[in-house]
Amino acid sequence: MLGTTEADLFVTPEMIESGEKTALYKGCIEWSEKTEELWGQPSYVYYFKRHLPGDDWGAFHCAELWYMFGTLDRCWRPWEEHDRKLSEDMLNYWTHFMRTGKPTDGDDWKPCTKENPYVKEFE
Protein backbone atom coordinates (compact mmCIF):
# COMPACT_ATOMS: atom_id res chain seq x y z
CA MET A 1 0.00 0.00 0.00
CA LEU A 2 1.49 3.31 -1.03
CA GLY A 3 0.36 6.73 -2.10
CA THR A 4 0.91 10.42 -2.54
CA THR A 5 -0.95 13.68 -1.96
CA GLU A 6 -2.29 16.28 -4.36
CA ALA A 7 0.16 18.99 -3.24
CA ASP A 8 3.04 16.63 -2.50
CA LEU A 9 6.74 17.37 -2.95
CA PHE A 10 7.75 19.07 -6.21
CA VAL A 11 4.15 19.95 -7.14
CA THR A 12 3.44 23.44 -8.45
CA PRO A 13 0.10 25.27 -8.20
CA GLU A 14 -0.11 25.09 -11.99
CA MET A 15 0.13 21.31 -11.89
CA ILE A 16 -2.72 21.10 -9.38
CA GLU A 17 -4.83 23.53 -11.41
CA SER A 18 -4.34 21.54 -14.63
CA GLY A 19 -4.82 18.15 -12.96
CA GLU A 20 -1.38 17.02 -14.13
CA LYS A 21 -0.17 13.94 -12.30
CA THR A 22 3.23 14.18 -10.65
CA ALA A 23 6.28 11.97 -10.86
CA LEU A 24 5.44 10.67 -7.37
CA TYR A 25 1.92 9.71 -8.48
CA LYS A 26 3.23 7.98 -11.60
CA GLY A 27 6.02 6.37 -9.57
CA CYS A 28 3.51 4.77 -7.21
CA ILE A 29 1.77 3.16 -10.16
CA GLU A 30 5.06 2.01 -11.71
CA TRP A 31 6.23 0.55 -8.39
CA SER A 32 2.93 -1.29 -8.02
CA GLU A 33 3.18 -2.74 -11.52
CA LYS A 34 6.80 -3.81 -10.93
CA THR A 35 5.86 -5.50 -7.64
CA GLU A 36 3.16 -7.45 -9.44
CA GLU A 37 5.60 -8.42 -12.20
CA LEU A 38 8.47 -9.50 -9.91
CA TRP A 39 6.64 -11.08 -6.99
CA GLY A 40 3.08 -11.59 -8.18
CA GLN A 41 1.77 -9.57 -5.25
CA PRO A 42 -1.02 -7.01 -5.48
CA SER A 43 -0.37 -3.42 -4.45
CA TYR A 44 -2.89 -0.79 -3.47
CA VAL A 45 -2.24 2.82 -4.42
CA TYR A 46 -3.96 5.91 -3.00
CA TYR A 47 -4.08 9.61 -3.86
CA PHE A 48 -5.01 11.95 -0.99
CA LYS A 49 -6.74 15.13 -2.17
CA ARG A 50 -8.52 16.44 0.94
CA HIS A 51 -7.64 20.07 1.61
CA LEU A 52 -7.24 20.27 5.35
CA PRO A 53 -9.39 22.92 7.03
CA GLY A 54 -7.70 25.88 8.69
CA ASP A 55 -5.35 27.16 5.99
CA ASP A 56 -4.80 27.22 2.24
CA TRP A 57 -1.99 24.68 1.99
CA GLY A 58 -4.16 22.03 0.35
CA ALA A 59 -3.31 18.33 0.53
CA PHE A 60 0.37 18.81 1.37
CA HIS A 61 3.02 16.09 1.87
CA CYS A 62 2.02 13.84 4.82
CA ALA A 63 -1.40 15.54 5.22
CA GLU A 64 -3.06 12.12 5.19
CA LEU A 65 -1.25 10.94 8.34
CA TRP A 66 -3.73 12.66 10.71
CA TYR A 67 -6.49 10.65 9.05
CA MET A 68 -4.58 7.40 8.61
CA PHE A 69 -3.66 7.15 12.29
CA GLY A 70 -6.91 8.58 13.68
CA THR A 71 -5.15 11.48 15.41
CA LEU A 72 -7.31 14.40 14.25
CA ASP A 73 -7.90 15.55 17.83
CA ARG A 74 -4.17 16.01 18.39
CA CYS A 75 -4.09 18.80 15.82
CA TRP A 76 -5.24 22.42 16.04
CA ARG A 77 -7.32 22.30 12.85
CA PRO A 78 -11.08 22.97 12.86
CA TRP A 79 -12.05 19.50 11.66
CA GLU A 80 -15.41 18.96 10.02
CA GLU A 81 -17.69 15.93 10.16
CA HIS A 82 -16.39 14.95 6.70
CA ASP A 83 -12.85 14.76 8.09
CA ARG A 84 -13.91 12.44 10.89
CA LYS A 85 -15.73 10.16 8.46
CA LEU A 86 -12.73 10.15 6.11
CA SER A 87 -10.41 9.28 9.00
CA GLU A 88 -12.70 6.45 10.09
CA ASP A 89 -12.81 5.08 6.54
CA MET A 90 -9.03 5.26 6.18
CA LEU A 91 -8.50 3.58 9.56
CA ASN A 92 -10.80 0.77 8.48
CA TYR A 93 -8.92 0.31 5.19
CA TRP A 94 -5.48 0.28 6.84
CA THR A 95 -6.59 -2.05 9.64
CA HIS A 96 -8.20 -4.46 7.20
CA PHE A 97 -5.04 -4.36 5.09
CA MET A 98 -2.89 -5.26 8.10
CA ARG A 99 -5.17 -8.18 8.97
CA THR A 100 -5.76 -9.60 5.48
CA GLY A 101 -3.27 -8.12 3.00
CA LYS A 102 -5.97 -6.14 1.18
CA PRO A 103 -7.75 -2.95 2.27
CA THR A 104 -11.28 -4.28 1.80
CA ASP A 105 -13.26 -7.39 0.95
CA GLY A 106 -15.37 -5.28 -1.38
CA ASP A 107 -14.69 -3.73 -4.75
CA ASP A 108 -14.18 -0.13 -3.62
CA TRP A 109 -10.36 -0.37 -3.61
CA LYS A 110 -8.97 -2.58 -6.32
CA PRO A 111 -5.30 -3.54 -6.67
CA CYS A 112 -3.23 -1.39 -9.01
CA THR A 113 -2.17 -3.62 -11.91
CA LYS A 114 -0.83 -3.16 -15.44
CA GLU A 115 -4.24 -4.09 -16.82
CA ASN A 116 -6.04 -1.76 -14.40
CA PRO A 117 -3.82 0.92 -12.80
CA TYR A 118 -6.47 1.71 -10.17
CA VAL A 119 -5.76 4.48 -7.67
CA LYS A 120 -8.08 5.05 -4.69
CA GLU A 121 -8.77 8.75 -4.16
CA PHE A 122 -9.43 10.18 -0.71
CA GLU A 123 -11.03 13.60 -0.84
Model-predicted regions and their roles:
Residues 2-123:
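C-terminal helix-and-tail extensions that cap enzymatic domains
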